[in-house]
Regions:
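Periplasmic-binding protein-like
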Residues: 86-90
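Twin-arginine (Tat) signal peptide motif
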Residues: 2-15, 21-28
Length: 263
């Protein structure tokens, strides 16, 4: 009787140990299959890309995303100097061309993904009614992105130059590190006006669109995307970039005010 009891206890202990070992092995296998994609993303894509990533991971649960948001020019510089990244989504062709010229893109992965427009915004209570009023005394500060690293700032510079206001308004400029910072300056009243993308303005309930910059006054606002050769998972990154042009992703972008670039 005692021997049988002892045997049963030993068998149960062995069974528990075996099950525990299997659980550990299965967990380890799942962990080994996990793919972490690091994406360097233009700040104006913050909301849209997070929605796209959430949709993608539903169909690809093994994939996890880590995002680095900022001005496209600054992100390109970081990547060029060795910052870890699998994917780059830029708000202008220039920063992407910079990496392409260095041979840092996965061949065939680059695509023009989205389009946007540039708008003049002001706080809700502002009486500003057009670009022509920016030079008046009621407007003391105007937020724009730094034209060097921030594509929205370059587009703003081009547009204001084309309509003959850039040099006149220069003393009023507050330069921001990203288009989202421009939006924040206007939202908080730290700037009387600002130039941002239409999608950024639409995401805020604290500003209003005063006017849209004429499209011919600045370069076309196109968002290219590409997988990076220096990333840890170039194949998975290329798959995600291709998926961003799919009908499922397209609806997520258009819901947020973007238009799709012609493929």
């Amino acid at each position: 009787m005692l021997l049988d009891t002892h045997r049963r206890i030993v068998c149960r202990a062995l069974a528990v140990a075996l099950i525990s070992s299997c659980v550990v092995l299965l967990t380890a296998c799942r962990t080994d299959r996990r793919i972490v994609l690091t994406a360097s993303v233009a700040a104006s894509l913050t909301d849209a890309i997070q929605a796209a990533e959430a949709a993608y991971t539903q169909a690809h649960p093994e994939v996890e995303f880590r995002n680095n948001f900022g001005g496209s020019g600054a992100l390109a510089q970081q990547i060029e100097h060795g910052a870890p990244a699998d994917i780059f989504l830029s708000a202008a062709a220039g920063p992407m061309n910079q990496l392409d010229d260095k041979g840092l893109l996965v061949p065939g992965s680059r695509r023009d993904l989205l389009r946007n427009s540039l708008v003049l915004i002001a706080p809700l209570q502002s009486t500003l009614s057009g670009f022509d009023q920016l030079a008046g005394p009621a407007v003391r500060t105007i937020a724009i992105g730094d034209p060097g690293p921030v594509p929205a700032g370059l587009y703003a510079q081009q547009s204001l130059t084309a309509i003959g206001l850039y040099n006149t308004l220069h003393p009023k400029f507050v330069f921001a590190e990203s288009v989202r910072q421009v939006l924040a300056f206007v939202e908080t009243g730290n700037a009387d006006a600002g130039l941002v993308y239409a999608t950024d303005a639409a995401s805020s309930g604290k500003v209003r669109v005063v006017a849209t910059a004429p499209a011919l006054t600045h370069d076309p606002i196109v968002y290219p995307a590409a997988a990076l050769r220096t990333g840890a998972h170039p194949a998975a990154a290329s798959d995600f970039v291709a998926w961003l042009a799919s009908p499922a992703a397209r609806s997520l972008f258009t819901q947020r005010g973007f238009t799709m670039a012609a493929q």
